[in-house]
UniProtKB/Swiss-Prot annotation:
<comment type="function">
    <text>Plays a central role in autophagy. Acts as core subunit of different PI3K complex forms that mediate formation of phosphatidylinositol 3-phosphate and are believed to play a role in multiple membrane trafficking pathways: PI3KC3-C1 is involved in initiation of autophagosomes and PI3KC3-C2 in maturation of autophagosomes and endocytosis. Involved in regulation of degradative endocytic trafficking and required for the abscission step in cytokinesis, probably in the context of PI3KC3-C2. Essential for the formation of PI3KC3-C2 but not PI3KC3-C1 PI3K complex forms.</text>
</comment>
<keyword id="KW-0963">Cytoplasm</keyword>
<dbReference type="GO" id="GO:0051301">
    <property type="term" value="P:cell division"/>
</dbReference>
<dbReference type="GO" id="GO:0006914">
    <property type="term" value="P:autophagy"/>
</dbReference>
<keyword id="KW-0472">Membrane</keyword>
<comment type="subunit">
    <text>Component of the PI3K (PI3KC3/PI3K-III/class III phosphatidylinositol 3-kinase) complex.</text>
</comment>
<dbReference type="GO" id="GO:0031966">
    <property type="term" value="C:mitochondrial membrane"/>
</dbReference>
<keyword id="KW-0968">Cytoplasmic vesicle</keyword>
<keyword id="KW-0256">Endoplasmic reticulum</keyword>
<dbReference type="InterPro" id="IPR007243">
    <property type="entry name" value="Atg6/Beclin"/>
</dbReference>
<dbReference type="GO" id="GO:0005794">
    <property type="term" value="C:Golgi apparatus"/>
</dbReference>
<dbReference type="Pfam" id="PF04111">
    <property type="entry name" value="APG6"/>
</dbReference>
<keyword id="KW-0072">Autophagy</keyword>
<keyword id="KW-0051">Antiviral defense</keyword>
<comment type="similarity">
    <text>Belongs to the beclin family.</text>
</comment>
<keyword id="KW-0175">Coiled coil</keyword>
<feature type="region of interest" description="Evolutionary conserved domain (ECD)">
    <location>
        <begin position="240"/>
        <end position="445"/>
    </location>
</feature>
């Protein structure tokens, strides 16, 4: 059994660049002392290594192996040299079992020496060892390229040196003449600089005299300025008193003129629009499905509208037929002259009752009747007066004569909120025109 048993020993070194496993040359097995000294000899830029260092390393380094009792194989990993210390870089792996203890010990020592040799070689240069053949060729190519560059630089320096050495005496004389000329220019410029410096000193003295004179004049100016300021202060006080009286008189005159020109109707009733709504004093008259205006605001807008028409009628001395306007804020209404017990409210609270109670619609139609009477009264004295939207009191509609030509009902029943809102907007526009006419007739005069 022992004679048929084969013993296998295998060592694994890796390339320090590509980390590929290496197969060492057989020459590593027969290293004598002379070869060791040649391989480990230091470079010119490296500190000298004593010949006995390698032997000392060999004699001091002790390696231990972990042996598996089950298969009798000793194993150890050899990492790359750049990531190891000098001692750990000598590690290797043995696979198999030696024939006897003495052979195993000699092999271990030889492999330690090989590992130490690679570490020493790595310490002599900037390249880590060992390297595979391909990485070695690549390294040699890089070194050849660097050598060619260095040789080219050396040749350039040599050519420059030859050019400098070939310079003749004429060039030297020309340079000396040029140097002499420059020296003369330097002396001339130094003299000019000295002259300028002397002139600068004279100018500095003149400046000092002028500065002293300026200080004296400034002191006199300050004294005169102080006296002037005192007189000016007294004058300003008197001017302030005079201007104060003039401003008071001017303000009183402006207020008087403003009161004379003030149009009470324009100042009290501001009719405008906000989107699709007509507004009076910023109260919107109408409502839309997308903008459900509160009824309190609509009632307040109706109250302002009734008050406006009532004021215009009083200014003209107009007495409405069939109805009397009763402005009471957001609870304004119309009183029937034929039936005084009958009141037509121009306010509403909404809700289900709103759809069945037509008094609100009757009140709006009655108000439209009053606007029509106002229009007819104005046309009696001014035939050229015309409201922008024609009103049909019998149908309770307002026609857009200048636009689409359609008519819009002022009633809420059987009517859409959009058309009702547009009819109210047209009615406010007519009132705005009536307000402008009254203002032009009674206030511009």
């Amino acid at each position: 059994m022992e004679t048929s048993k084969s013993s296998t020993m295998q060592v694994s070194f890796v390339c320090q660049r590509c980390s590929q496993p290496l197969k060492l040359d057989t020459s590593f097995k027969i290293l004598d002392k002379v070869t060791m000294q040649e391989l480990t000899a230091p470079l010119v830029t490296t500190a000298a290594v004593k010949p006995g260092d390698i032997q000392e390393v060999d004699s001091n380094i002790e390696e231990t192996f972990a042996e598996n009792r089950t298969d009798g194989v000793s194993r150890r990993l050899i990492p790359p040299a750049r990531m190891m210390s000098t001692e750990s870089a000598t590690s290797f792996t043995l696979i198999g079992e030696a024939s006897d203890g003495g052979t195993m010990e000699n092999l271990s020592r030889r492999l330690k020496v090989t590992g130490d040799l690679f570490d020493i070689m790595s310490g002599q240069t900037d390249v880590d060892h060992p390297l595979c053949e391909e990485c070695t060729d690549t390294l040699l190519d890089q070194l050849d390229t660097q050598l060619n560059i260095t040789e080219n630089e050396c040749q350039n320096y040599k050519r420059c040196l030859e050019i400098l050495e070939r310079m003749n005496e004429d060039d030297k004389e020309k340079l000396e003449a040029k140097l002499k000329e420059l020296a003369e220019d330097e002396d001339r410029l130094i003299q000019e600089l000295e002259e300028v410096e002397r002139n600068r000193e004279l100018v500095a003295k003149d400046i000092e005299k002028v500065r002293e004179e300026a200080e004296r004049l400034e002191q006199e100016e300050a004294r005169y300025q102080k006296e002037y300021s005192e007189f000016k202060r007294q004058q300003l006080e008197l001017d302030d008193d005079l201007k104060s009286v003039e401003n008071q008189m001017r303000y009183a005159q402006i207020q008087l003129d403003k009161l004379k020109k003030t149009n009470v109707f324009n100042a009290t009733f501001h009719i405008w629009h906000s989107g699709q709504f007509g507004t009076i004093n910023n109260f919107r008259l109408g409502r839309l499905p997308s903008v459900p205006v509160e009824w309190n605001e609509i009632n307040a807008a109706w109250g302002q509208t009734v008050l406006l028409l009532h004021a215009l009628a009083n200014k003209m001395g107009l007495q409405f037929q069939r109805y009397r306007l009763m402005p009471f804020g957001n609870h304004s209404y119309l009183e029937s002259l034929t039936d005084k017990s009958k009141e037509l409210p121009l306010y509403c609270s909404g809700g289900l009752r709103f759809f069945w109670d037509n008094k609100f619609d009757h009140a709006m139609v009655a108000f439209l009747d009053c606007v029509q009477q106002f229009k007819e009264e104005v046309e009696k004295g001014d035939t050229g007066f015309c409201l922008p939207y024609r009103m049909d009191v019998e149908k309770g509609k307002i026609e857009d004569t200048g636009g689409s030509g359609g008519s819009y009902s002022i009633k809420t029943q059987f009517n859409s909120e959009e058309q009702w809102t547009k009819a109210l907007k047209f009615m406010l526009t007519n009132l705005k025109w009536g307000l402008a006419w009254v203002s032009s007739q009674f206030y511009n005069k």
